């Protein structure tokens, strides 16, 4: 199993969700967060002077998939979140050793 962690623009969350649902990947956790990378936050002007706003609003998405679905999910997330502008986000893929559905006790792929 693989845990895909995607950091995307907040306005792309629904597009990413729809892309994953289209692949039959039905579970996802989404959190609001703030961050910065190459863009080093963003700058704003207030009555003339430029102010550094620091962090940029982002959405952190987590989805656990079967090994066989990981590459398709990664491609779908990248396509759905892409604008071509700085700040589109990043995707990380991490190995998952075990998973368990608490309600039923199902394990690993069956828990997804």
List PLM regions with ranges.
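Positively charged, small/polar-rich N-terminal and surface patches that mediate targeting and assembly
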Residues: 1-112
């Amino acid at each position: 199993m693989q845990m895909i962690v995607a950091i995307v623009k907040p306005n792309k969350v629904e597009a990413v969700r729809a892309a994953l649902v289209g692949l039959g990947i039905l579970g996802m956790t989404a959190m609001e967060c703030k961050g910065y990378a190459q863009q080093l936050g963003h700058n704003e002007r207030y009555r003339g002077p430029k102010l550094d706003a620091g962090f940029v609003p982002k959405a952190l998405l987590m989805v656990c998939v079967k090994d066989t679905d990981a590459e398709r999910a990664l491609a779908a997330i990248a396509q759905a979140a892409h604008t071509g502008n700085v700040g589109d986000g990043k995707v990380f893929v991490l190995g998952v050793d075990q998973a368990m559905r608490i309600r039923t006790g199902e394990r690993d792929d069956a828990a997804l």
